[in-house]
Swiss-Prot record:
Organism the protein comes from: Heterobasidion annosum (Root rot fungus)
Signal peptide: 1-21
Annotated S-S bridges: C57-C118, C64-C112, C65-C98, C119-C132
A Pfam family matched in the record: Hydrophobin
GO annotations of cellular component type: extracellular region; fungal-type cell wall
Subunit structure: Self-assembles to form functional amyloid fibrils called rodlets. Self-assembly into fibrillar rodlets occurs spontaneously at hydrophobic:hydrophilic interfaces and the rodlets further associate laterally to form amphipathic monolayers.
Sorted UniProt keywords: Cell wall, Disulfide bond, Secreted, Signal
UniProt GO molecular function: structural constituent of cell wall
The gene coding this protein: Hah1
Protein purpose: Aerial growth, conidiation, and dispersal of filamentous fungi in the environment rely upon a capability of their secreting small amphipathic proteins called hydrophobins (HPBs) with low sequence identity. Class I can self-assemble into an outermost layer of rodlet bundles on aerial cell surfaces, conferring cellular hydrophobicity that supports fungal growth, development and dispersal; whereas Class II form highly ordered films at water-air interfaces through intermolecular interactions but contribute nothing to the rodlet structure.
InterPro entries: Hydrophobin
Similarity comment: family membership: Belongs to the fungal hydrophobin family.
Protein name in UniProt: Class I hydrophobin 1
Domain of life: Eukaryota
Localization in the cell: Secreted; Secreted, Cell wall
Amino acid sequence: MFFRISTVFVVALAAFAAASPAPWGAPPPTTTTHPPVTTTVTVTAPATTTTIPASQCNTGDAQCCNSVQSATAPAVTSLLGLLGIVLEDINVLVGLSCDPISVIGVGGGANCVQQPVCCENNNFNGLINIGCTPINIFL
């Protein structure tokens, strides 16, 4: 008699354990996925990178960037990947952490301690500017 009760108890306990998928008090797991967002940017690079006067910056605003690197640099490719930006031409310069500078106030109003560049209107809130060309703000 004791053997039958023990067997029924063990079978019932195993069935109960198999029927409860989540730990006590934990909500069932939910998985939400969002489709990836990809931004494609077309930038044409100059044949050679030359320094141009700030007054000739006609492809966009003059920017003062903390860093200007090739699009193939590891830090730049990581950032482009995180932002979902795909470049069609990887032979371009990319400005990182850029702020607009005033070309009108050459001298005092155009202070840029880092790298002054002219970019092709492909900026992402100053975090990254694509298609940059170095400029000389003192010409």
